[in-house]
């Protein structure tokens, strides 16, 4: 293909009358006429802010606007059916679709757990500034609105390497979770802050083999369900090089 042209088909403050998926389906022919050969879509799954979420506060990767969760069925961009229709319309006009995906973290846990942690220096994440202690944190994800459809995997504190909120203490800090996979962080591409594994929310621990398997299963399901042509992986400098 000569001169392939990819358009970022979203922005942070999108608020037009048509939701984004409907707009994309309507504009597919026009985009092709302008020479666009690919579109980059925002995260299509449910974030912790439900229908208001931009998509980078990942809650449920399997909820593409299908289930009543986080106070909404659809996402900010529309329903699962509208998403699939937009992809189909773009494909009819020979336009590829890239899905934005956040594997780095999850947000909006459903249940509290008691978690062993150590505080770290926010400017140097390799420096512990406390001994081990226990907090209560929103680290259990059961996705009650989905009720096990597509995946019965339950995320708990063993799936995460760090968090930033202690519910019982009502305290915000960076807490390194102490689990069977290590007391600190994973090796990641970025050495900012000493080690930039932790970015925000519940930081996913790729040292856990069950986590790796679940994300691979999700990728297979997503390709089969949506027909997208590829992924743009968000926040890669914060993700384990071994997983990448």
Model regions and ranges:
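Substrate-binding/active-site clefts of carbohydrate-active enzymes
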Residues: 3-26, 33-37, 41-82, 86-221, ...
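Short strand->helix junction
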Residues: 14, 236-238
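Short catalytic-loop micro-motif centered on adjacent basic/acidic residues
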Residues: 98, 230-236
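Extended hydrophobic/aromatic segments used for targeting, binding, or gating
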Residues: 239-244
């Amino acid at each position: 293909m000569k001169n392939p042209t990819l358009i970022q088909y979203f922005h942070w403050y999108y608020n037009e009358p048509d939701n984004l998926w409907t707009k994309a389906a309507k504009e597919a022919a026009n985009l092709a006429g302008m020479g666009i050969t690919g579109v980059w879509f925002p995260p299509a799954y449910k974030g912790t802010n439900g229908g208001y979420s931009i998509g980078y506060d990942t809650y449920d990767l399997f909820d593409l606007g299908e289930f009543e969760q986080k106070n909404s069925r659809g996402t900010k961009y529309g329903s699962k059916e509208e998403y699939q229709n937009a992809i189909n319309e773009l494909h009819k006009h020979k336009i590829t679709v890239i899905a934005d995906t956040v594997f780095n973290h999850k947000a909006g846990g459903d249940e509290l757990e008691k978690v062993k942690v150590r505080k770290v220096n926010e400017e140097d994440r390799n420096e512990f500034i406390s001994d081990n202690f226990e907090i209560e944190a929103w680290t259990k994800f059961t996705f009650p609105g989905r009720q096990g459809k597509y995946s019965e995997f339950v995320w708990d504190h063993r799936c995460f390497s760090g968090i930033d909120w202690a519910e019982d203490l009502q305290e915000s800090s960076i807490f390194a979770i102490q689990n069977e996979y290590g007391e600190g962080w994973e090796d990641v591409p970025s050495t900012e802050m000493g080690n930039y594994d932790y970015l925000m929310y519940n930081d996913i621990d790729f040292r856990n083999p069950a986590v790796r398997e679940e994300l691979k299963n999700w990728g297979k399901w997503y390709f089969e369900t949506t027909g997208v042509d590829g992924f743009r992986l968000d926040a890669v400098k914060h993700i384990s090089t071994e997983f990448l």
